[in-house]
């Protein structure tokens, strides 16, 4: 036992530097991945969409809508505070309370904004200004105030259609197994599925084997062939009451 302990102590005395075990790459720890540039006109559209959404969703007899006037004040302050170049926006609660002149109502006003806006997970102390407070409804309420994207040029649309047709023709020319290898992103899973399809195609009867199986199935069927109609021989008319009985039978 003491020899094993000594061997372990001798190995632990190396001069190699210790390397930390990083579970995630450094890009995931950087906040630059979270922030995105926000143009100034989009910030104005966000605030205008929130105001129109507040008026459109306000119930009769209520003082405020689903957001509230304090939430609009907070959103107005955030749109003026955001860095349009990189989209960074991380004010503290005390700063927001001081700037808009609100106390506890500031905390309650942030909740409707979070509930009606997309908020990334793992960002408890950061704010984002997406133009999706309640799906596509605020964007529809903006109407003409939202900048619409320019239509695609004719050559770009034609190039996209040609590329789509080329890809479709290529996929149609492939076998089912090769099509799985092209479409499934996981290579291991793609090979497994392609192997299943190829083995199923090999075990499927075709050609002479298929014809033999069909003949065997036809022999095992219980359908009787159509037999010709039986006629009474004319040499024994007395068995059926003479000629009259034979005519009645026929």
Curated annotation (Swiss-Prot):
Q: List the keywords (alphabetical).
A: DNA replication, Plasmid
- Where is region (Disordered) located? 1-23, 168-250
Compositional bias per record (Basic and acidic residues), positions renumbered to this chain:
13-23, 178-190
User: Which ranges are annotated Polar residues under compositional bias?
Assistant: 218-237
**Superkingdom per UniProt:** Bacteria
Tell me, what is an example of a GO biological process annotation in this record? DNA replication
Q: Which cysteines are joined by disulfide bonds?
A: none
Q: What does this chain do?
A: Required for replication. It likely regulates pTAR copy number.
Q: What protein am I looking at?
A: Replicating protein
Organism expressing this protein natively: Rhizobium radiobacter (Agrobacterium tumefaciens)
């Amino acid at each position: 036992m003491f020899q094993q302990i000594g061997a372990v102590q001798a190995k632990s005395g190396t001069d190699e530097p210790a390397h930390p075990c990083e579970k995630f790459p450094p890009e995931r720890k950087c906040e630059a991945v979270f922030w995105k540039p926000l143009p100034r006109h989009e910030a104005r559209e966000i605030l205008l969409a929130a105001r129109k959404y507040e008026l459109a969703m306000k119930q009769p007899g209520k003082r405020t809508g689903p957001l509230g006037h304090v939430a609009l004040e907070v959103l107005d302050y955030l749109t003026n505070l955001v860095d349009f170049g990189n989209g960074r926006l991380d004010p503290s609660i005390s700063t927001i309370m001081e700037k808009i002149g609100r106390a506890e109502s500031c905390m309650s006003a942030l909740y409707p904004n979070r509930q009606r806006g997309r908020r990334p997970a793992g960002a408890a102390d950061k704010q984002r200004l997406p133009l999706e407070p309640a799906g596509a409804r605020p964007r529809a309420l903006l109407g003409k105030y939202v900048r619409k994207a320019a239509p695609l040029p004719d050559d770009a649309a034609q190039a996209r259609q040609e590329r789509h047709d080329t890809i479709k023709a290529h996929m149609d020319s492939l076998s089912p197994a090769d099509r799985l290898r092209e479409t499934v992103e996981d290579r291991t899973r793609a090979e497994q599925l392609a192997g299943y399809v190829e083995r199923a195609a090999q075990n499927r009867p075709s050609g002479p084997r298929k014809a033999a199986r069909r003949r065997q199935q036809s022999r095992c069927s219980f359908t009787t062939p159509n037999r010709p109609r039986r006629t009474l021989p004319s040499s024994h008319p007395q068995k059926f009451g003479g000629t009259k009985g034979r005519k009645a039978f026929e």
